[in-house]
Structure formats: C-alpha cells, structure tokens
C-alpha cells in the first residue's frame, strides 16, 4: 500500500508493505541520488536490523555509516543531539547527503530534529520499527527533543522524503511496546474514524491486532495523512491528534521519562480528560466507559497513583498548546469525532483537583 502526503511545499509517500525492510536499498535508491547515507538507530534496533539494513543499502551503491544511541526516552535530549551532530561532522556529511531514522518514536523524533538542524537541514527518511511510530510519530514532520521542563519542548517541523513501514518488525517488539502503539491506534479511532473503532472492537486482543497490522496501520496512516494535509503546522485541526497527550505528556514528565511509556501516558490522559469532559457536558455520558473498555481489552492502564497536582499543573502549563493564557484541550463529541476547546490555564487546577481523579 502506498499513501501520498501532499503538502504545499513538499510531498512524499508512505509505503506500507510486509517485508519492505528487506528491500530498503531499492526503496532508498528510488528516492535519492546521494551516495552517502548516515543511519541513526538505537542499540536495541541495531542488534536486530542494523547490519542487514547497511548491507542492503551498500548493495544499492550507498556508502553508509551508522550510530546507535541508547534505547529509551532518555536519549531524546539536546545532549544526545549534540553527539549526533558531532558524528555527522566526523563522517563529513554534507547537505547533499542523507540520513535515515531507523527505530521507534524516540529515534524518529531525535533523528528528524538532527536532520532538520544539521547544516540548516539535510534530507532524511523515516523507517519506523515500532507500532507507535508506524501509526503516528513517523508521519507529519514533527521533530523534537525533551527538556527537564517538558516533553517535546524544543523541535521543528521538517517533512521526510519518505516513510517505509514494514509490519514484520512488530514480530520483534516486546508486548509493552506493542501496547504503546495500540494506545495511539485507539486515539486515532476515537477522534476521527468510528469504523476503525468498530474494527478494533471486533479484535480479541493485542495478538489479534498484530495479525491484522497492515490493515490497521494503513487506516491510521490515512487519518494522520488527511489531518496533516489540512493543517501541517499544528495551528488548528491537527491539534485533535493530541487527544490525551496534554495530561499524558505531563504524567511522563512528572514520573521521569521512561517510567510511564508514551502510549501509557496517552491512555491515562484520554481517560482523565474524558472524565472531565463528561462532567463539563462536553462529551456524552458513557464515553469514558467506552474508552476504558477498549483500553483494558488491550491491557493499557486506565488508572495510576502517579498523580501530583502541583507537578502536573506545572508540566501542563508548559505544554506547547498553551497560548495567551489559554490551553487547547481535545475532547470527544462522540466516538469517532473530536473537537477543540480553549480553557484558561487557571482552571487547570480545578480539573486536576476534582473528586475522583485518576
């Protein structure tokens, strides 16, 4: 399956194909003429796919270099970015060369950020190997690193030249990482595709979803593609993709990056904000329970004891969606349809402190 992301200044294809990683050299050659390619990956993915990917690229005539960062959210930092800048400079990569992000969401965000800022921008490709990255973070051009203050606080918009998605990589993914991706899939269905929601309802568990991965990934990529085409720079409609993310990011930040996985934070965030939305009359009664039922089926968390009102308030008010004393909150009008509401930041405390918090 091939989907095209069509934007005013740059368009590119999403290639979704089981076994596609085995033909990565041919794919890259169809997109690029540069002879030198740097691969950024993490230590876990490198052990699984690094050598094979380099071999395929070299067979296609590319000169390759590879660097593997530590696996995990802690690598998504300015300090790691500096190490990567130094590596690219040592390899004498220029703006006529290219970079490949091979890995999950952390690698994709980090490598995309580095590619967009090294020498004021070099060409790059996304090759996501986790379910979360395949259905969400590899598409749309958002790149970022974290700081101590907030997740994704420093970043750019930079579109790749292409995205290669091979569902076979899910076979080597540990169950917790599969569930992370499922949280983003549930989010996508909840905000924009009731038919996908019904399809997810028909699946028995995580294993059943992975067995239908190409179908599910394609559906999510279509949602992301359509939203990004309408709002590339996150000024309006694209904000709906952040459903559950404001509180989710805050939970990740306050717990310490890596303690609560991104998908787990999103799961908790969707429940929390929907409980609030029901109380405010913004979402129909029973919507929270529909989410709980779906998320629990896939063994995603819906409650947590990691709830510090003050630290969460500080993290939320540093969120990128806070502008002019207002924060944009995404709520469900119904399953399959989201809307954006503005909330004064001073009201966040009342939300966090309400009776029955998560």
UniProtKB/Swiss-Prot annotation:
Binds 1 divalent metal cation per subunit. Can use either Co(2+) or Zn(2+). Zn(2+) binds at residues 184, 245, 262. GO terms for molecular function: 3-dehydroquinate synthase activity; metal ion binding; nucleotide binding. InterPro entries: Dehydroquinate_synthase, DHQ_synth_AroB, DHQ_synth_fam, DHQS/DOIS_N, DHQS_C. Keywords: Amino-acid biosynthesis, Aromatic amino acid biosynthesis, Cobalt, Cytoplasm, Lyase, Metal-binding, NAD, Nucleotide-binding, Zinc. It is found in: Cytoplasm. Its EC number is 4.2.3.4. NAD(+) binds at residues 105-109, 129-130, 142, 151, 169-172. SUPFAM superfamilies: Dehydroquinate synthase-like. Its cofactor is NAD(+); Co(2+); Zn(2+). It comes from the Bacteria. NCBIfam families: aroB. Belongs to the sugar phosphate cyclases superfamily. Dehydroquinate synthase family. This is 3-dehydroquinate synthase. It comes from Enterococcus faecalis (strain ATCC 47077 / OG1RF).
């Amino acid at each position: 399956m091939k989907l095209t992301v069509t934007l005013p200044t740059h368009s590119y294809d999403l290639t979704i194909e089981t076994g596609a990683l085995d033909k990565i050299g041919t794919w890259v050659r169809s997109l690029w003429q540069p002879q030198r390619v740097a691969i950024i990956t993490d230590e876990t993915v490198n052990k699984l796919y690094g050598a094979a990917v380099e071999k395929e690229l070299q067979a296609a005539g590319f000169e390759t270099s590879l660097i593997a960062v530590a696996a995990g959210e802690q690598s998504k930092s300015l300090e790691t970015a500096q190490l990567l800048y130094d590596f690219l400079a040592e390899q004498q990569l220029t703006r006529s060369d290219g970079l490949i992000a091979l890995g999950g969401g952390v690698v994709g965000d980090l490598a995309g950020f580095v590619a967009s800022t090294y020498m004021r921008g070099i060409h790059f490709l996304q090759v996501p190997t986790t379910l979360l990255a395949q259905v969400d973070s590899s598409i749309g051009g958002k790149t970022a690193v974290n700081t101590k203050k907030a997740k994704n606080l420093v970043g750019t918009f930079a579109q790749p030249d292409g995205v290669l998605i091979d569902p076979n990589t899910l076979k080597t993914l540990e169950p917790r990482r599969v569930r992370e991706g499922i949280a983003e899939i549930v989010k996508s269905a909840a905000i924009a595709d009731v038919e996908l929601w019904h399809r997810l309802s028909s699946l028995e568990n995580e294993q059943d979803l992975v067995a239908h991965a190409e179908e599910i990934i394609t559906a999510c990529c279509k949602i992301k593609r359509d939203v990004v085409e309408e709002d590339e720079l996150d000024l309006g409609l694209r904000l709906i993709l952040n459903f559950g993310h404001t509180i989710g990011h805050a939970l990740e930040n306050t717990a310490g990056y890596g303690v609560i996985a991104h998908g787990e934070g999103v799961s908790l965030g969707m429940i929390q904000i929907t409980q609030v939305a029901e109380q405010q009359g913004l979402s129909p009664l029973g919507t929270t329970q529909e989410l709980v039922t779906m998320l629990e089926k896939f063994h995603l968390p819906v409650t947590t004891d990691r709830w510090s009102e003050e630290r969460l308030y500080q993290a939320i008010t540093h969120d990128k969606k806070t502008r002019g004393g207002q924060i944009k909150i995404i709520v469900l009008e119904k399953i399959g349809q989201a809307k954006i509401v503005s909330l004064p930041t001073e009201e966040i405390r009342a939300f966090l402190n309400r009776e029955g918090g998560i």
